[in-house]
Amino acid sequence: EGTLNAKIVKNWFEEKIGEPFENKFSAIGFLKDDKIQAAAIFNNYTGNNIDFHYYGPRITRGNYREIIDYVFNFLKCNRLTTIPHREHKKTLIILPRMGFMQEAILKYYYGVDDSKDGLVYVLTKDRALDWLKTKDK
């Protein structure tokens, strides 16, 4: 475990998703045996909200706790937003289990057919804290 420079994490993330990440961002790299196993990238910070992107084999409770702590305690946001593709079925199953609520559908967000819609999911601070309480039992 440990932390890495955000640029190193960004480069790893871009290599995994196969496209550049252009916005101003912050990042958390999750390590195992001194190698990045997963990454969380945050961008479009408004003071109240930040957008969230994750790449990894799965999101562990420990990783998720770090993400919640960073977003809601360090940044003092009131919401965390992610916009997965409609076709990312595993993600769409996992997000509600993590306390996220679907807020909107962005037609053709990732392309020109219905499978390329973006689904806006939001985790509010109160729901994140509730999730932490239920998982601490």
Predicted regions and their residues:
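Conserved GNAT acetyl-CoA-binding A-motif
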Residues: 73-84
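Conserved catalytic-core motifs of GNAT/GCN5-like acyltransferases
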Residues: 101-116
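Conserved acetyl-CoA-binding loop-helix of GNAT-fold acetyltransferases
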Residues: 59-73, 89-97
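Conserved beta-strand-loop-alpha-helix junction that forms the acyl-donor binding cleft
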Residues: 82-92, 109
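Short amphipathic alpha-helix that is part of the acyltransferase structural core
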Residues: 1-18
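Short hydrophobic/aromatic beta-strand or adjacent loop that forms the aromatic wall/cage
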Residues: 25, 116-120
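Conserved acetyl-CoA binding element of GNAT-fold acetyltransferases
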Residues: 45-57
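Conserved beta-hairpin
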Residues: 24-38
